[in-house]
Amino acid sequence: MDNLNELVKECGVELYDTEIANENGRAIYRIYITKNGGVSLDDCEKVSRLLSPIFDVEPPISGDYNLEVSSPGLERKLSEARHFKASLGELVKAQTAEAKFAGRLVKADDESIALENDEGVFEIKIGDIKKAKTYLEW
């Protein structure tokens, strides 16, 4: 669905990411949304009520599925430059083909990020990152 961003914006939130998962043999189409000040249950409900009838006519995936709408959570996947920019100052784990890094995200632009930990500051090109997510230290 090409206009998913625009549809979600009608509800006063931003599209963060989508995901297709399989849990207990059931397909789940997840839509993650964000907004300044945090996402409420009402926000999720608005998006779900807007998209459900549209997806009944133009399904986002083939076959039977459940639609879930939620915030990306405190420990969330980072895959786009905008995700990293919005996570400045947070703890991030990133994996490239060569190494794994963990530290505080101290820089993020369209091309690269920088993670700082006790060993120093590590600059990583976003295109080299295979997997990244925020994490909490308890």
Curated annotation (Swiss-Prot):
InterPro entries: Ribosome_maturation_RimP, RimP_C, RimP_C_sf, RimP_N, RimP_N_sf
An individual GO BP term: ribosomal small subunit assembly
Organism name: Campylobacter curvus (strain 525.92)
Coiled-coil region: none
A family per Pfam: DUF150_C
Protein role: Required for maturation of 30S ribosomal subunits.
Listed GO CC annotations: cytosol
Protein family per UniProt: Belongs to the RimP family.
NCBIfam families listed in its UniProt record: PRK14639.1 (NF011232)
Name of the protein this chain belongs to: Ribosome maturation factor RimP
Keyword Signal: no
